[in-house]
Amino acid sequence: MRLEITVFPKSGRFEVVSKEGRVKVFLKSAPENNKANIELIKEMKKLLKADVRIVSGLTSKRKVLEIQMSKEELERLLSIDL
């Protein structure tokens, strides 16, 4: 499953929210030396208990993640509608 997200680094917390059909991910880390991307992958893997990788947007706030699970399972785990 591919998931389009917008990340907000240096937010002081890790949180995934869905608002107006968009998924937003708030990160503690700064977007320096790949720290925000590393936190994103680590925390999403821990939350979803699935393989997660960034397929697009390594240097952008807008990213596409590839997650090894069904859309329904992803919606249930994140409590969002896609």
Predicted segments, located by residue:
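Beta-rich strand-turn-strand
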Residues: 46-50
